Design a protein with these regions (language model features):
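Leucine-rich tandem repeat or coiled-coil scaffolds
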Residues: 1-422
Length: 422
């Protein structure tokens, strides 16, 4: 096994494989051919290179290149930096980060005062890397943003990270999206959120959580710090949304709730419409890719017209809503002065729908940047076309050119700007 010096692991960490023999240097664009060491220009890059040599760990030149970029920023006197080692870059060769790579990385970041964000999305750190991510959360008191989405982390890794957050008081934004932590991991996150008092933004989307939704609902009754919660693809049905709604009666902090890509129907909208009559904190609600249909849209419309004056953005994209329900939503916007963003693409438009939303835009009640449709006329008939606006168009990817952070494409983060700069 490797010599881990003073960082002795407690009993029970995920086992590391035997140390590989030092690998030949790859001839990447930032690594000189022939295996010679690259020019060292800063402390992070130098520390990483030296530690890899000391521990006989293969050097990941993608990490080395990214550390070089951060070193340059530090030399300019900048602080509060995010180290971005995303494994889905299209602009350069990528050697994805493994759990063993993350071990070395965590050791050099543990006392760094300049970096407060770490983005390692779309890599392969697995439960081994999750163990070291948990250690980092325990020791690094500057980190406010950690993105671990799609990293093959399982229930054991989810448990380690959740337990590390029991005592962490600095992390504000955590993305666990796409890691299959399952119900076991979800239970530990639910328990953590009853204790943690600093986390403001959490994404547990596509983590294969089902029963845990009930426990997360109970957690919202106790937690008064969380501002944004993403629960996409949880297989939430009407009983699950009822549990969440019961918690929202008592929660006074949540401003952004994302329950897209679930199995919520019109019956679930009865509970949600009721809680929106009294809830005054929720500002963004994402119901995309459910099946609320006309009845569900009408329940929401009645509440928005008569009671709620706090919701600013609503997405009902692809919900099998027909003209009757869509027109009801448009009518509620004429009465409700607060609701500014509505997203409806993927439903069943008739001519009455097209005319209703065209009128909203013509009168200035619905701004072109605040919806995902635009009107056009052919032979005297009004139609709606899709435009690339939404609550989180660039949540899972960013364009490699052009404006990466258009407000109209990511309106949810503009309206509720928790960690929006990260």
């Amino acid at each position: 096994m490797w010599d881990r010096c003073s960082e002795a692991a407690p009993a029970g960490p995920p086992p590391l494989p035997p140390a590989p023999a030092p690998a030949a240097t790859r001839a990447l664009s930032w690594a000189p051919a022939g295996g010679s060491a690259p020019e060292i220009i800063g402390h992070l890059q130098e520390n990483y290179y030296n530690l890899c040599v000391e521990k006989s760990q293969k050097i990941n030149y993608f990490i080395l290149h990214k550390l070089q970029e951060v070193d340059k920023e530090i030399e300019k006197g900048l602080e509060g930096l995010t180290l971005n080692i995303a494994g889905n870059s299209c602009l350069m060769p990528v050697e994805r980060v493994t759990g063993e790579d993350f071990w070395i990385l965590s050791r050099i970041l543990k006392k760094n005062l300049y970096i407060n964000g770490l983005d390692v999305r779309y890599n392969l750190i697995s439960d081994v890397g999750a163990y070291y991510a948990a250690r980092l959360l325990q020791k690094q008191h500057k980190l406010i943003y950690l993105n671990l989405m799609f990293n093959d982390i399982g229930p054991e890794g989810g448990e380690l990270i959740a337990k590390a957050l029991h005592k962490n008081t600095t992390l504000k934004y955590l993305r666990m999206t796409g890691n299959k932590i399952e119900n076991k991991g979800g239970m530990f996150f639910a328990a953590m959120l009853q204790i943690n008092s600093s986390l403001e933004k959490l994404d547990l989307g596509d983590c294969d959580l089902e029963e845990s939704t009930v426990h997360l609902g109970h957690m919202l009754k106790e937690n008064h710090c969380l501002v944004e919660l993403h629960m996409c693809k949880h297989n939430i049905k009407n009983c699950g949304i009822k549990q969440l709604c019961d918690a929202l009666y008592l929660n006074g902090s949540l401003r952004y709730l994302d329950v897209s890509c679930n199995k919520i129907t019109r019956d679930g909208m009865v509970y949600l419409a009721d809680v929106l009559k009294t809830n005054t904190t929720l500002e963004v609600l994402d119901l995309s890719f459910n099946r609320i249909e006309n009845a569900g849209a009408k329940y929401l419309s009645e509440t928005l017209a008569s009671h709620n004056r706090s919701l600013k953005a609503l997405s009902v994209v692809s919900n099998n809503i027909e003209g009757e329900g869509l027109v009801a939503l448009s009518q509620s916007m004429k009465i409700n002065p607060t609701l500014s963003n509505v997203y409806i693409w993927g439903n069943k438009f008739d001519e009455a729908t097209c005319v209703a939303y065209s009128e909203l835009m013509q009168m200035g009640r619905l701004k072109p940047d605040n919806t995902d449709v635009e009107a056009f006329v052919v032979d005297g008939h009004v139609y709606l076309a899709e435009v690339s606006n939404g609550l989180k168009k660039h949540y899972y990817w960013r364009p490699t050119y052009g404006a990466a952070c258009r407000h109209s494409a990511n309106a949810g983060f503009t309206l509720v700007p928790v960690g929006g700069h990260l």
